[in-house]
Amino acid sequence: MTPLFERIETRRAWTDDERLVLDSVRRLADEVIAPGADTYDRSGDFPADNIAAITDLGLNGLFVPEAYGGNPISYRLYLACVRTISEACASTGITYATNFHGLGPLVEFGSEA
């Protein structure tokens, strides 16, 4: 992490619940995602195992309303999750971040039909 981001990070006031999410994401990034990062980056393969692990942790439901089984969080916390995952594996990070671009319009503009 660059000195600028380190300074910003020390000024953030995360709630206990947000810290729990960040700790879980950091553990996932360190233990599951980072070990295979070089392989995915070299091969160009889709990081299916990493995305499955992200899904298992519940991170793909972060912008889905609770009524539909989601676990909504702040955009700030989402960005911290994306950064942590991307630091571990750029391929996985961009794939995870792209999920929001597909999901966001569905949540925002979708109907019950």
Question: Model regions: which residues?
Answer:
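Alpha-helical hairpin
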Residues: A13-W14, F46, I73, G110
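General structural feature for long, well-ordered alpha-helical segments within catalytic domains
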Residues: V21-V25, F46-N50, L77, C81
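Intrinsic disorder at enzyme termini
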Residues: M1-L20
